[in-house]
Amino acid sequence: MEQTYQYAWIIPFLPLPVPMLIGLGLLLFPTATKSIRRMWAFQSVLLLSIVMIFSMNLSIQQINSSSVYQYVWSWIINNDISLEFGYLIDPLTSIMSILITTVGIMVLIYSDNYMSHDHGYLRFFAYMSFFSTSMLGLVTSSNLIQIYIFWELVGMCSYLLIGFWFTRPVAAKACQKAFVTNRVGDFGLLLGILGFYWITGSFEFRDLFQIFNNLISNNEVNLLFVTLCAVLLFAGAIAKSAQFPLHVWLPDAMEGPTPISALIHAATMVAAGIFLVARLMPLFIVIPHIMNFISLIGIITVFFGATLALAQKDIKRGLAYSTMSQLGYMMLALGMGSYRSALFHLITHAYSKALLFLGSGSVIHSMETLVGYCPKKSQNMVLMGGLTKHVPITKNSFLLGTLSLCGIPPLACFWSKDEILNDSWLYSPIFAIIAWSTAGLTAFYMCRIYLLTFEGHLNVHFQNYSGKRNTPLYSISLWGKEGSKISNKNFRLVTLLKMKKNGPPSFFSNKVYKMDENVGNLVQPFISIPNFGNTKTSLYPYESDNTMLFPILIFIPFTLFVGFLGIPFNQDVDILSKWLTPSINLLHKNSNNLIDWYEFSKDAVFSVSIASFGIFIAFFLYKPVYSSFQNLDLINSFVKMGPKRIFSDKIKNAIYDWSYNRGYIDAFYGTFLTVGVRKLAEFTHFFDRRIIDGIPNGVGFISFFVAEVIKSVGGGRISSYLFFYFSYVSIFLLIYYFLNF
């Protein structure tokens, strides 16, 4: 066992040769390197698989022995300064390593087909492999300096992948937004690290925790300064894990390829912030009020992310806000001191969210055959619907991921989320009410995404698809009512069903309206995709290839069964509790991990009832209302009610505007921060040019002007200069005489 731990340092470096060799190959032998590009993808998967096997071996030993292994190399510069590097293997490291490798392998396999038509195929795999290396280095770090180094590398890889299609202005802007937002958090993290080093004199976790606990117990530190340093450390996690108010980069990050969205949201960048707080938990729990602050940020993020997901039309952005909300649950659990629940939900959510993102990628891939390559169209749920019979495997897998995130037993997320919800009652009733109500919102918006995507009819066929937004059908509201802003107010469904010659086809017509053959020219392509140019596009979507379906099918058993790892039916069977021994749990300090069946059943019924209510509301609003003639009277009755629905419409429109405009946080930043910084820069420029430079320039100009006047008066004659000279001397002598008289 000791020998296995000794070679654990190789974990983060095994995937590293792939990006290095790809980079050298593209520089020195570009043609040959591109000709064997599938071989590089195979090597990426192979090396990451070796890391996964090694991580699983370490995890088995962790479960059996609950040991912690740390190895440190010291580089002594002089008697006062030494640099220490090492690796730390504990339960948190082994859990994160398995999570990163399993999700990473499946995403790489999926990407082989998804990115096969992209000219940046090799560049993508180089970034992905380096991303895995950086994240593995982060979770195995034994001190804060290594944490910060790999933290920055993780951020760099995410920026490269978010802006992977950098020729698209929106992708380049999203990359810049992620970079600037995370700069704020990373700067806080750096200041926090330096602050705690100044207090304790150590970067190593063990020494840092021990020294700091002694200082706190002896009351030898300034609590205000310590709290400030802790908040700065936590700021790094806020930005990385997209917590309020530094969450604004996450939805825009969906401009990157879908596989990287799955990796970022499941096992890498956003998980890094949760990992950091979990790693520093022994530090945070002894600082007054910092745990309360963490839980406060978590509960705000939970509710904020859920409300922002309610009206998203982009399928990936809807899932992105879902990730934000679920990360808020994890942060809430950490703030409550429920360490096990937070990591449990991190595991279950990772596999469910990876399944959902890969499923959404399959949907987008199939929609591109209809609308051409244009993310605004292929990712727009308004144009989807009715995909059940076209992509049945994707549909069923997406449904499982949706039900898991909704909290339906016995799927994975039910067990972990239910544990967090139950713990929230012990911590704060107010937080518990918000968390439980948000669970209902989660079920609502996830079911909404599923219904808009897969149920009903294929909406893209119900208009003369030319990219214009002036057709009535394009404005089908996502709130279950007609879109009055764009649609004709006198438009009725009966009229729609009668249109067969001059308008869009009937929902029940066997005739299929042909799409514009030049739809691919609406957006300037930045990658070359066969069949997406000026050629005719397909009339119906089709299921993805086996290479893309295989990872989706692999994630299904994870979504079904990974939750059973943490079910405390019996102390000997609860693998997660044994894995995390010793664990931090401030809410159940004397717990013996045995389940109270009555409490469990009561809480489970309540939790499932709330989720079922959210699903029912979503089904009522977003069910395929055009699927039968029986719905015609119902819809027209809603339309005819007129003024009676004005108040409820105002409420729904307010909620819709809040959600669709991202809670106005982006507008606030744009108005006050961006404009404020620009105004400050303009004022600084004015002050520098007019005041700072104006004073010496003014003195110089006055001196030059006086000299020119004197020069013009003198006329260039020596006799004139002598006359003025003696005149001034005489004047000064007279003044001196009268002053001393």
Swiss-Prot record:
Protein role: NDH shuttles electrons from NAD(P)H:plastoquinone, via FMN and iron-sulfur (Fe-S) centers, to quinones in the photosynthetic chain and possibly in a chloroplast respiratory chain. The immediate electron acceptor for the enzyme in this species is believed to be plastoquinone. Couples the redox reaction to proton translocation, and thus conserves the redox energy in a proton gradient.
Record GO cellular component, one term: chloroplast thylakoid membrane
Record-level GO BP terms: ATP synthesis coupled electron transport; electron transport coupled proton transport
Reaction(s) this enzyme catalyzes, per UniProt: a plastoquinone + NADH + (n+1) H(+)(in) = a plastoquinol + NAD(+) + n H(+)(out); a plastoquinone + NADPH + (n+1) H(+)(in) = a plastoquinol + NADP(+) + n H(+)(out)
Enzyme nomenclature, EC number: 7.1.1.-
Xref: InterPro entries: NADH_UbQ_OxRdtase_chlpt_su5_C (IPR002128), NADHpl_OxRdtase_5_subgr (IPR018393), ND/Mrp_TM (IPR001750), NU5C-like (IPR003945), Proton_antipo_N (IPR001516)
Protein family: Belongs to the complex I subunit 5 family.
PANTHER family linked: NADH-UBIQUINONE OXIDOREDUCTASE CHAIN 5
Membrane topology (UniProt): Multi-pass membrane protein
One GO MF term attached to the UniProt entry: quinone binding
Enzyme class: translocase
Subcellular localization(s) per the UniProt record: Plastid, Chloroplast thylakoid membrane
Pfam family, any one: Proton_antipo_C
Transmembrane segments: 9-29, 40-60, 89-109, 125-145, 147-167, 185-205, 219-239, 258-278, 284-304, 327-347, 354-374, 396-416, 425-445, 549-569, 605-625, 721-741
Name used for this protein in its record: NAD(P)H-quinone oxidoreductase subunit 5, chloroplastic
Keyword Flavoprotein applies: no
Summary of subunit composition and partner proteins: NDH is composed of at least 16 different subunits, 5 of which are encoded in the nucleus.
Assigned keywords, A-Z: Chloroplast, Membrane, NAD, NADP, Plastid, Plastoquinone, Quinone, Thylakoid, Translocase, Transmembrane, Transmembrane helix, Transport
